[in-house]
Structures are given as C-alpha cells and as structure tokens.
C-alpha cells in the first residue's frame, strides 16, 4: 500500500493533483474538496496521506490532507453500496468530523445533503457504520497531534531516524 506521497505539486484541479517525487515519479491523486482548499501553490512541496484502490482496469490513489480524513474514507468504504467515488464525494461535501458526527447521531438530513445519497443510502450508512466509528478520533487539522501527551514519534529517513517526545 502507498500510505503517503510527498514531493513537488506540479498540477492541481478541484478533484485531483499530481505530485512529482524527488525520485522523479509523478503520482496522480484523486482528492476531496477539503484537501484542495489546503494545498500549497504549484511548484511548492506537498504531502498527502493516501489510500490505494486496485481495480481490474486501474490503480487509483486517493489523497487526503490528514490521516484522520483517510481513516474516515476507509471506514465509509466498508458501508454497503459505497465505492471510492461516493466516499470521496461525501468528504467533498461534509468535513470528516461532520460526516462522522452525522453517522453517529443518525442525522439523515445531513447525510441526504450529499449528492447521490438519498434516504435509503443514508439509512444504510448509519446501519453499517454507526457502531464502527467509535475508535476514529479527530485530528483533521493539519499538524494536529492525536497522540497522548508525551507520546514519541520517529522522524527522518532510512538510517536517520530520530526519536523525540511530543510536547
């Protein structure tokens, strides 16, 4: 799985970007509107959390500004009748937090505000996901730290790992 792509932003549209890595590989990544709004200018460095979908006819990368958005996307894919395009559409219409809250609170009206989600689909989302979002914690703001105070993280590349305590 390709969990993250970082490099120079060479192209951006409302629904997709292209990132050229330092190794010279360019990745086309499908994104929700919320991710587009936080992108840097063309030519600047960008980093996206990604989810790879392998189909018979294509390999598609979906990218998100935060790991939280990616986790919500992955959970929504587990609902009956929801594919990557609809899940991405949900995150383009609602923030990840609002989507999770709507499902937990069984808010049919909010869910039906998403294009291609009618009453039956909203009910199915609630049925399939209401009890499966309990461990999905919010860290949607770029740079947010969901870990407990004092947690450690590893920074640096291969052979250059540096451990530090979180403030």
What spans do the regions from the language model cover?
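A general alpha-helix detector
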Residues: 71-72, 86, 106-110, 150-158
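Glycine- and Gly-Pro-enriched alpha-helical subdomains that act as flexible
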Residues: 112-115, 125
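Strongly charged, low-complexity linkers/loops
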Residues: 125-167
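Amphipathic, charged-and-aliphatic alpha-helical interface segments
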Residues: 52, 59-64, 84-103, 124-137
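A positional/architectural concept
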Residues: 1-78
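A short amphipathic alpha-helix within small helical-bundle interaction modules
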Residues: 76, 91, 99-104, 111-112, ...
